[in-house]
Structure formats: structure tokens, C-alpha cells
């Protein structure tokens, strides 16, 4: 019954996160010391960040495949766009890796990209990695989202500092009831707070969904406008790709993602 109610309440137009321009809706400014693994992606011609990502070690960043762009610049150790941290660093990609050696992905599968930096970054107060998941999150888990994405939608208001919010892992059937066009199974996580407007928005794409101190998800896509009527968001399920991630980082660049 609950699923049917949600389906009736949440009549939405689908859009990839990059199309709906997501930032954290309903959140507050992150503490400057709580996100040393959070990176910002943009191009020199962009006036705001295009996407976010997660630092896995000194040379590797995890983000969404749909965040790929030409002339990408990667900022690490950043908090306030207007006031750089002393240990802030900038890098560019040396190599990019996708599941199928190309940018083939869907709303429910393979929206994941690994970036090898052109040179390692030193760890510091504001630069440190986040661990890959040791197990998938369970329904009901409280998880953390963060990013420089829009704090309002559809009239986007982009902040100078990252915003953070807590959301819950929901049963996949909730997202299926909300969006209608999803397959019976997918390598994604459904997360949000039903009937509350808290979630990711423009600019948050590629950033982490953090559960128990591990990166469990990658911001992939959501409703348009963001979190419309409390609609949940979809996140790439990192646990399903851990073998591929470790293989690529370990030097097996021909590794393929799970089918």
C-alpha cells in the first residue's frame, strides 16, 4: 500500500543528475574537517563545479561516468571556493577508466568512472582517502551525502561551500514505484527521506553516498526538479564494482565490470 501511495504522490519527470543540476537540497554546510576525501570536478570555462568525486588513494578518484568532460580539472582539499585552504591541490586526469572501456552506461547500470591523477597528492589535514565498502548497506541505514551542488531547485542556488545531509537507504521497490521505468534488478541504491525534500541536486553528481564511514554509493540521477515531493535519488552501488575498482587500481587495466 505504501508503495502505491508513493507512486501516486511522486509523478515525476526523470532526468540524469547532470541534467537536473543537483546540489544537496535540505542540508547544511559541511564541517570543514569532515570531507577530506571529497573532490570537485570542473573545466576552466565553467563558473561552477560540474561534479564531485571521492579520493580513494593518493592517485585515484571515483566518480560517475556521466561526469566525464574535456579539460577536466580536479580540486582536492577544497572547502570554500572563495577562500582556498593552504593544503588545497589541483590535478588533471592522467587516465580515465569506464566499465566497458567507453562511456556506455544507463540510469540503472555502470554509471561509474575511475580517474588516475597526473601526479599523486600528499595527504594532509584536508586531503585523505575514503574506504571502499566491505559490505553493501542495509535498508534503513543512515547515510551521508555532500557536495557543492544546488541548494534550491528548479531555481538553483549554488553555494561557495559544500552542504551535507543525512538520508536513508530505501528498498529498491520504492524507487521503482516512484519512477516506473526501472528494471526489476539493478546495480543501484535507492536513498532519500520519503515526503521530505532532502537529497542531491545539480553539481552533486559523482559525489559519495557514505554509510558507516565507507563510500557505498555514487550520486547518479534523480527527479527534476530535485527531490520533487520528496522523491528518492539513485546512486551507483559501489559494492558491486569493488572487484573492478581494485583490479584497475592494481594495474589490470583490461578488467571489466560485472554484467
Swiss-Prot record:
Intrachain disulfide bonds: 30-164, 51-67, 99-257, 143-211, 175-190, 201-226
Known role: Snake venom serine protease that may act in the hemostasis system of the prey.
Residues making up the signal peptide according to the UniProt record: 1-17
The name this protein goes by in its record: Snake venom serine protease rhinocerase 5
Glycosylation site residues: 80, 102, 155, 252
Propeptide segments, given as residue ranges: 18-23
Keyword Lyase annotated: no
Organism: Bitis rhinoceros
Entry's Gene Ontology BP terms: proteolysis
Cellular component, GO annotation: extracellular region; secretory granule
Amino acid at each position: 500500500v505504501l508503495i502505491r501511495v508513493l507512486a501516486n504522490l511522486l509523478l515525476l519527470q526523470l532526468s540524469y543528475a547532470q541534467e537536473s543540476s543537483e546540489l544537496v537540497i535540505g542540508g547544511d554546510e559541511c564541517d570543514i574537517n569532515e570531507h577530506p576525501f571529497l573532490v570537485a570536478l570542473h573545466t576552466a570555462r565553467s563558473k561552477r563545479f560540474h561534479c564531485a568525486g571521492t579520493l580513494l588513494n593518493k592517485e585515484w578518484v571515483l566518480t560517475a561516468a556521466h561526469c566525464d568532460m574535456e579539460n577536466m580539472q580536479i580540486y582536492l582539499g577544497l572547502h570554500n571556493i572563495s577562500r582556498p585552504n593552504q593544503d588545497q591541490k589541483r590535478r588533471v586526469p592522467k587516465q580515465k577508466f569506464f566499465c566497458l572501456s567507453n562511456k556506455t552506461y544507463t540510469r540503472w547500470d555502470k554509471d561509474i568512472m575511475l580517474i588516475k591523477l597526473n601526479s599523486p597528492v600528499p595527504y594532509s589535514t584536508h586531503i585523505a582517502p575514503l574506504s571502499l565498502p566491505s559490505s553493501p548497506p542495509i535498508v534503513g541505514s543512515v547515510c551521508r551525502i555532500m557536495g557543492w551542488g544546488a541548494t534550491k531547485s528548479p531555481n538553483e542556488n549554488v553555494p561557495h561551500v559544500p552542504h551535507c545531509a543525512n538520508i536513508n537507504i530505501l528498498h529498491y521497490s520504492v524507487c521503482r514505484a516512484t519512477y516506473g521505468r526501472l528494471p526489476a534488478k539493478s546495480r543501484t541504491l535507492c536513498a532519500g527521506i520519503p515526503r521530505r525534500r532532502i537529497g542531491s541536486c545539480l553539481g552533486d553528481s559523482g559525489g559519495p553516498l557514505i554509510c558507516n564511514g565507507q563510500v557505498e554509493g555514487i550520486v547518479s540521477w534523480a527527479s527534476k526538479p530535485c527531490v520533487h515531493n520528496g522523491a528518492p535519488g539513485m546512486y551507483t552501488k559501489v559494492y558491486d564494482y569493488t572487484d573492478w575498482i581494485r583490479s584497475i587500481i592494481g594495474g589490470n587495466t583490461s578488467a571489466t565490470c560485472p554484467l
